């Protein structure tokens, strides 16, 4: 894993095309990301997926939301190492709820994740867990009404659908 972290994602894409003997590899995200630590090595690991939302308050009972959140943490704790948390924000371009910040980077690092990729915003730049990069669609100040909607059912981020166990190589590209 150490060697893979030392190269950037465009190099990985090129290597895959060489190995396939043709151009046209397209298993990568589209769009522009914000990287919490753009000069850090790449994030390499196996996907652990979830979907979140937060623009509006959840309509389910608080005990249901709380139980799902605990199931989410158990899900992130499981799986092969190293792990990358991948969260799709179902609010899309209107996403305002930053799941990823100081608290969640610290918690997920403790669960064995080495980084996160999200279609939603991140926050608490400068206060995130050291060595836990987040690659997000945007930066925002609030967690709003963020809550977990699905766990382990896949997550689509910038046009690429991730499934649990997918091998990920990600950086500021």
Residues covered by each model-derived region:
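Extracellular/luminal Protease-associated
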Residues: 74-118
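General beta-strand structural signal in soluble alpha/beta enzymes
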Residues: 25-28, 86-88, 116-120, 136, ...
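Short coil/turn connectors at secondary-structure junctions
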Residues: 44-45, 80-83, 111-114, 129-132, ...
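Buried hydrophobic positions in well-ordered alpha/beta secondary-structure cores of metabolic enzymes
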Residues: 16, 108, 166-168
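Ligand/cofactor pocket segment of small-molecule handling proteins
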Residues: 105-144
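Acidic, glycine-rich flexible loop/linker segments
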Residues: 137-173
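Intrinsically disordered, low-complexity regions enriched in acidic/Ser/Thr/Pro/Gln residues
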Residues: 1-79
């Amino acid at each position: 894993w150490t060697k893979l972290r030392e190269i950037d994602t465009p190099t990985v894409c090129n290597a895959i095309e060489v190995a396939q003997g043709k151009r046209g590899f397209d298993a990568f995200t589209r769009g522009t990301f914000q990287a919490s630590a753009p000069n850090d090595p790449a994030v390499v690991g196996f996907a652990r997926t979830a979907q979140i939302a937060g623009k509006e308050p959840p309509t389910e009972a608080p005990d249901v939301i709380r139980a799902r959140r605990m199931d989410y943490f158990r899900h992130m704790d499981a799986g092969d190492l190293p792990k990358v948390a991948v969260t799709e924000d179902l609010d899309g371009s209107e996403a305002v709820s930053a799941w990823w910040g100081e608290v969640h980077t610290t918690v997920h690092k403790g669960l064995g994740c080495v980084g996160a990729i999200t279609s939603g915003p991140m926050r608490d730049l400068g206060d995130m867990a050291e060595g836990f990069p987040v690659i997000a669609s945007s930066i925002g100040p609030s967690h709003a009404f963020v809550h977990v909607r699905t766990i382990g059912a896949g997550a689509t981020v910038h046009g690429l659908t991730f499934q649990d166990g997918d091998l990920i190589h990600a950086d500021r590209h």
